From Swiss-Prot, chain A:
Protein name from the UniProt record: Recombination protein RecR
GO MF term list: DNA binding; zinc ion binding
SUPFAM superfamilies found in the cross-reference section: Recombination protein RecR
Gene name of the encoded protein: recR
Species assigned in the record: Thermobifida fusca (strain YX)
SMART domains per record: TOPRIM
Swiss-Prot record, chain B:
Database matches in NCBIfam families: reco (TIGR00613)
Gene3D superfamilies in the record: Nucleic acid-binding proteins, Recombination protein O, C-terminal domain, Recombination protein O, zinc-binding domain
HAMAP family in UniProt: RecO (MF_00201)
Protein name, entry field: DNA repair protein RecO
Upper classification of the organism: Bacteria, Bacillati, Actinomycetota, Actinomycetes, Streptosporangiales
Keywords for the protein's UniProt record, in alphabetical order: DNA damage, DNA recombination, DNA repair
InterPro entries in UniProt: ARFGAP/RecO (IPR037278), DNA_rep/recomb_RecO_N (IPR022572), NA-bd_OB-fold (IPR012340), RecO (IPR003717), RecO_C (IPR042242)
Biological processes per GO annotation: DNA recombination; double-strand break repair
Organism encoding this protein: Thermobifida fusca (strain YX)
Listed Pfam families: RecO_C (PF02565), RecO_N (PF11967)
SUPFAM superfamilies, per database record: ArfGap/RecO-like zinc finger, Nucleic acid-binding proteins
Family: Belongs to the RecO family.
Function: Involved in DNA repair and RecF pathway recombination.
Name of the coding gene: recO
Length: 199, 243
């Protein structure tokens, strides 16, 4: 245990995802040794992210205005919506340059064991967007793991009566992984080879 | 002897750090085991799919100070890939996995009968021959019975006088006679009670022939009974969908 402020910092850092007690200690001493100006830049970045960043009113992606950059872009194709779990999946798919449509970010996957059901995700918002009638294809790009698949199954069943084309990314994406870890080439191929779901 | 091999079913996974995952297994010989699968969230990992919930695996583990580490894993049966294509079956399956973990609860204490029960339950669910909600309720009742909490259905839970009795009291342990019945007892339909008896015995012929409203009532009784006996309750039960 260290005294007051240093221990406080170690405790706070240790609560971040992927940071264990050893790393927390290493980061804390790095900050202690760093230039004051560098630390202030970090502090400002932390404050700015909480004050300025919000979620897009249309798709749920990260945004600095009411709508995100992609929803504001008039060149994007309004007839295709790609459904993902998290904003970081939007980034992963944008990197492939394979997709020119719009996104819908669910805010997670259905996870009964964590108590997360369809009502806890942005499913109602998705249905509302689809009911406007411009969309002809919905691509289900939830993670290629069990909870992602279960979420896709749930959505496919829900969308069936709407008569839209519902597709799922082609396998070739390794099962059990997170979408964000797929490399551009694999993810790009998964987009090209997406298959229609018939439930 | 820090390396050991066992056969188990993946109950749950939790992300750990950047790319690792903690998996909770119910094994044949060791009971409940929590272990780390290193790098399994990376898409190149061969382990990833094998360490997903519902997978029946042959696994080699390295015993660690706090958590064991998965060093080798082979799939024996991948029930998840079938269950995930059908939402009601999937949610019933998740409730089974969560119940298994909560009923066994103590780590590394052999629970062979619980392992066999879960394995049989998942197999039945994957085969799809019965209503998933019936498979789930049968599993819940039997899992509680193996743990020593079988509900009294044919005799009074309090005094043991043979039935049939009309009233059910969760906190008394099942059906109760008219003399013992505590406040808060409910009066289920005889058909719903008969369905619980059939599920506990594995009488699928009677269970499959049951009416929808009796299944609903039976599920309600089983859920109330389960939540009473498991300290923290089974969260996923709320999200189980009817077929
Ligand atoms: Zn947006
Ligand atoms: Zn009695």
């Amino acid at each position: 245990m260290y005294e007051g402020a240093v221990q406080n910092l170690i405790d706070e850092l240790g609560r971040l995802p992927g940071v264990g007690p050893k790393s927390a200690q290493r980061i804390a001493f790095h900050l202690l040794a760093a230039e004051t100006a560098d630390v202030h830049r970090l502090v400002n970045a932390l404050v700015a992210v909480k004050e300025r960043v919000r979620f897009c009113a249309v798709c749920g992606n990260i945004a600095e205005e009411t709508q995100c950059r992609i929803c504001r872009d008039p060149r994007r194709d309004d007839t295709v919506i790609c459904v993902v779990e998290e904003p970081k999946d939007v980034v992963a798919i944008e990197r492939t340059r394979e997709f020119r449509g719009r996104y819908h970010v669910l805010g997670g996957a259905i996870s009964p064991i964590e108590g997360v059901g369809p009502d806890d995700l942005r499913v109602k918002e998705l249905m509302a967007r689809l009911s406007e009638g411009r969309v002809t294809e919905v691509i289900l790009a939830t993670d290629p793991n069990l909870e992602g698949e279960a979420t896709a199954t749930y959505l496919a069943r829900l969308l069936k009566p709407m008569g839209l084309k519902v597709t799922r990314l082609a396998s070739g994406l390794p099962v059990g992984g997170d979408l964000e870890y797929a490399d551009e080439v694999t993810l790009g191929r998964a987009f090209e080879g997406r298959r229609a779901l018939d439930f | 002897m820090s390396l050991y091999r066992d056969e188990g079913i993946v109950l749950r996974t939790q992300d750990l750090g950047e790319a690792d995952r903690i998996v909770t297994l119910l094994t044949r010989r060791t009971g409940l085991v929590r272990a780390v699968g290193k790098g399994v969230r990376r898409t190149r990992s061969r382990f990833g799919a094998r360490l997903e919930p519902f997978t029946h695996i042959d696994v080699q583990l390295h015993a660690g100070k706090s958590l064991d580490v998965v060093t080798q894993v082979d799939t024996l049966h991948a029930y998840g890939s079938v269950l995930v294509t059908d939402y009601p079956r999937y949610t019933a399956g998740v409730a089974m996995l969560e119940t298994a973990e909560k009923v066994v609860s103590v780590e590394k204490d052999p629970a062979l009968r619980q392992f066999l029960l879960l394995w049989g339950g998942l197999r039945t669910l994957a085969e799809g021959a019965h209503d998933p909600r019936l498979v789930l309720d049968a599993y819940l009742l039997r899992s509680l019975a193996v743990a020593g909490y079988a509900p009294a259905l044919e005799e009074c839970a309090h005094c043991g006088v043979p039935g049939p009795h009309r009233e059910f009291a969760v906190h008394a342990g099942g059906m109760v006679c008219s003399l013992c019945r505590p406040a808060g007892s409910v009066k289920p339909s005889p058909a719903a009670v008969a369905l619980m008896v059939a599920l506990l015995r594995g009488d699928w012929e009677s269970a499959d022939a049951s009416a929808e409203r009796d299944r609903t009532e039976c599920s309600g009784l089983v859920a109330a009974y389960l939540q009473w006996h498991l300290e923290n309750g089974v969260r996923s039960l709320r999200l189980v969908e009817r077929a």
